[in-house]
Structures are given as structure tokens and as C-alpha cells.
Regions:
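Acidic donor-binding loop of glycosyltransferase active sites
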Residues: 251-270
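Conserved acidic donor-binding segment of nucleotide-sugar-dependent glycosyltransferases
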Residues: 301-312, 322-328
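Membrane-proximal helix-turn-helix segments that form the acceptor-binding/catalytic region
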Residues: 55-59, 99, 114-134
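Carbohydrate-associated surface elements
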Residues: 140, 161-162
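Nucleotide-activated donor-binding/catalytic signature segment of Leloir-type glycosyltransferases, i.e.
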Residues: 225-256
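Glycosyltransferase donor-sugar binding loop
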Residues: 188, 214-227
Length: 329
């Protein structure tokens, strides 16, 4: 894979905002290995406007100035339209997500056997087939892409995510009055289906009678999408959103973090290492992970890294209690 980047002239294209963690990670990789690189990205808050801005720039770029094009987030939105422009350069892709898997199997926007589902599957397959090298976020995802889309296994390479350690690092914070002596259990996330928010909230419900446990949930919960109403209790705090610097302070304050993923039936949840896990690792916080192949690629069971059966709130509740009893406040 490195032969396509090392000492090469690279054009990096991403449809995600430039400061997105995966972009900064890959740009740092280019900084280290490429002879020089150019970034085509956009800061538009509107995704359609961002795409149009990128497309306009691509129409005017001179590809004879580059050896390699590196397609960052969502290469499916670029390669099908501009393959003609990239025919004389090597193509590296970050296949961070499958459109088919995300929209049909994870978020269930379309049926897999529908016209759109089949089209998304074809776009994923063709995008993968045209690459000389493909970055995946886990070995588990690489295996899935090879099996589901017939991607060449020899072209698939794993680049794990990492946390932004300028924000997420060990720190000490003072607890609010009333939380001294309590065990704070924290969940934070963007509340995507694969994360398993219903499992987390059911776990809070099972444990809300423990006076010395305090639960904090940070993320934009949509109540209408929950299987059951969210539990309400004096020992449960909900926060819709926090800037990253403030989120880091809450993580530092927590005793135990629920990293996930916890959904029991979405396949993608078993092939992905949650960003939460990388953040907790960077901040040296105890965490509970979903018991799946992807998480086991990087993490081993220990006193402060626990695995739990996915889709089972009772198992998660028992794991929290067991950890709490070993680490009394």
C-alpha cells in the first residue's frame, strides 16, 4: 500500500469537513510519507453545497501534476463521477463506510432488495473494484467488504481510528456538589442505531434504584425512535450535546464509560470499533465494550477493559455492578 503514497505527489479528496478526525489522521499520514499533497475539501455546512464545491474544483484540477489520488470519506460520491479523470493515476480509497450497509442494513432507509438497495450495492462494489489500495477501519470490515462486494483481499489494509489527543487525554476535574462518593457511569455518542441506545437506557432503568450509582447520557436522543420511553430518575442525567472540550471533562469525571457498540442484531455494530473506545483509551478510562471481533482486534479483557454480550441490557447491568463492587468509591 505504501508504494502508492511514499514519495508520491498525492491529491487528497474528501467530502467530509477537513477537521473530521479521519481526515486529520489521513492528512497526517500524507504529511509523513508523500513528497507533497493537495487537499480538496469544503467547509460548507450544507452537504450538497460541499459536494458541488468539490466537484467544481475537480473539474479544473490537472491530474498530470499527481501520481496518486487519495479518496477520503465517501469515495462512492466521487469515483463514479470522476473515474475518467483518474485513469492515469493510482487510486487509494478510505472505504470507511459502505453506503449499502449503512443505509440498508444499519439505518434501514431502504430494503436491501429494493432498486435503491441494489444500486447502492453496485456502487460500493464498483468503487472498491477500481481502487489500487483500500483503507478499512477494522479487519472485520475488510473481511466483510471482500465477502459482500468481492473486493480483492490483497488490496485491503486496516487503518485504525485514533482519538484527538490534543483534546482527549488524562485530566483531573472537580465533581459537582452531590456527586462526591458516587460511581459515575457515562455513555456518550451520536445515537446512531448500531450504537444500541435502547440497550443503554434499559440498563439505566435496571439500575436506577442504586443510590450510589449516577448515570450520564450525552447525545441527541430522539424519543420517538426509542422502543421504550427513556427512564427518568434523579440518578440519570441527559445532555443533548457538548463541545468536545467539555465532553472530555465529563469523560474525565466518569468512573466507568460504556463504549459499545451494544446493538445486538445490526451486523455493522460487530465490525466497527467505536470512536468512544479510542477516546476512553486515550483518556485511560475504564470501559465496557461490546463483545465482537472488531473490538477484540485492539482490546484485551482486563480489570478496566470489559466485554459484554451485545443486545443484552441485563448482561450490561451485571457487568456494571461487578465492576463497581471491585472499585468502591
Amino acid at each position: 500500500m505504501l508504494q502508492y503514497i511514499k514519495n508520491k505527489r498525492v491529491l487528497f479528496i474528501t467530502t467530509k469537513n477537513p477537521d473530521y478526525i479521519r481526515n486529520t489522521q489521513e492528512i497526517a499520514f500524507l504529511e509523513e510519507h508523500a513528497s507533497f499533497y493537495t487537499v480538496i475539501a469544503s467547509t460548507h455546512t450544507s452537504y450538497p453545497k460541499r459536494l458541488l464545491s468539490i466537484y467544481r474544483r475537480l473539474l479544473t484540477v490537472h491530474m498530470n501534476e499527481y501520481d496518486t489520488v487519495f479518496l477520503g470519506f465517501a469515495p462512492q460520491l466521487v469515483l463514479p463521477l470522476f473515474a475518467w479523470k483518474f485513469k492515469n493515476v493510482d487510486i487509494v480509497e478510505d472505504f470507511f463506510i459502505s453506503m449499502y450497509d449503512t443505509l440498508c442494513c444499519d439505518r434501514c432507509k431502504f430494503r436491501p432488495d429494493s432498486y435503491i438497495g441494489k444500486l447502492l450495492h453496485k456502487i460500493d462494489r464498483l468503487t472498491l473494484s477500481r481502487a489500487d489500495a483500500v483503507f478499512c477501519d477494522t479487519h472485520a470490515h475488510a473481511q466483510y467488504f471482500a465477502q459482500e462486494f468481492q473486493a480483492d483481499p490483497d488490496k485491503l489494509f486496516t487503518m485504525y481510528l485514533h482519538a484527538d489527543t490534543t483534546i482527549y487525554h488524562p485530566m483531573s476535574v472537580n465533581r459537582p456538589a452531590g456527586l462526591e462518593g458516587k460511581c459515575i457511569v457515562l455513555y456518550f455518542g451520536s445515537i446512531l442505531p448500531l450504537q444500541g441506545i435502547d440497550i443503554v437506557l434499559d440498563t439505566f432503568r435496571l439500575l436506577d434504584h442504586y443510590a450510589n450509582l449516577y448515570f450520564i447520557c450525552i447525545g441527541p436522543i430522539q424519543d420517538e425512535k426509542l422502543t421504550n420511553p427513556r427512564p427518568m430518575s434523579d440518578c440519570i442525567q441527559y445532555i443533548n450535546w457538548l463541545p468536545q472540550e467539555e465532553l472530555a471533562r465529563y469523560i474525565a469525571m466518569a468512573d466507568l464509560c460504556l463504549a459499545g457498540h451494544f446493538h445486538g442484531s445490526i451486523g455493522k455494530a460487530r465490525r466497527t470499533i467505536p470512536l468512544n473506545a479510542y477516546i476512553c483509551q486515550a483518556m485511560k478510562k475504564p470501559m465496557i465494550l461490546g463483545d465482537n471481533a472488531a473490538n477484540h482486534e485492539l482490546f484485551k479483557e482486563s480489570d478496566n477493559i470489559l466485554f459484554v454480550e451485545m443486545g443484552n441490557s441485563h448482561a450490561l447491568a451485571n457487568e456494571i455492578i461487578a465492576w463497581w463492587k471491585k472499585h468502591p468509591q
